[in-house]
């Protein structure tokens, strides 16, 4: 799992 990309996706979804 790419946590940096996942984190960015979560932030963009907020």
Curated annotation (Swiss-Prot):
Alphabetized GO MF terms: toxin activity
GO terms of biological process kind: chemotaxis; defense response to bacterium; defense response to fungus; innate immune response; killing of cells of another organism; venom-mediated mast cell degranulation in another organism
Protein known as: Polybia-MP-II
Biological role stated in the UniProt entry: Antimicrobial and mast cell degranulating peptide with chemotactic activity for leukocytes. Is active against both Gram-negative and -positive bacteria (Staphylococcus aureus (MIC=2 uM), Mycobacterium abscessus subsp. massiliense, S.aureus (EC(50)=1.83 uM), Escherichia coli (MIC=5 uM), Pseudomonas aeruginosa (MIC=38 uM), Bacillus cereus (MIC=5 uM), and the multidrug-resistant bacterium A.baumannii), and fungi (Candida albicans (EC(50)=12.9 uM, EC(90)=15.3 uM) and Cryptococcus neoformans (EC(50)=11 uM, EC(90)=22.7 uM)). Inhibits biofilm formation of A.baumannii and Staphylococcus spp.
Main localisation: secreted
Biotech utility: Could be used to treat biofilm-resistant agents such as A.baumannii and Staphylococcus spp. coated on the surfaces of implanted medical devices, such as vascular stents.
Organism encoding this protein: Polybia paulista (Neotropical social wasp)
Keywords attached to this entry: Amidation, Antibiotic, Antimicrobial, Chemotaxis, Fungicide, G-protein coupled receptor impairing toxin, Immunity, Innate immunity, Mast cell degranulation, Membrane, Myotoxin, Secreted, Target cell membrane, Target membrane, Toxin
Modified residues (Leucine amide): 14
Family (UniProt): Belongs to the MCD family. Mastoparan subfamily.
Cell compartment(s), UniProt: Secreted; Target cell membrane
Leftover remarks: The primary structure of this mature peptide is identical to that of Polybia-MPII from Pseudopolybia vespiceps testacea (AC P0DQT3).
Tissue distribution of the protein: Expressed by the venom gland.
GO cellular component terms listed in the entry, alphabetical order: extracellular region; membrane; other organism cell membrane
């Amino acid at each position: 799992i790419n946590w940096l990309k996942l984190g960015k996706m979560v932030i963009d979804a907020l």
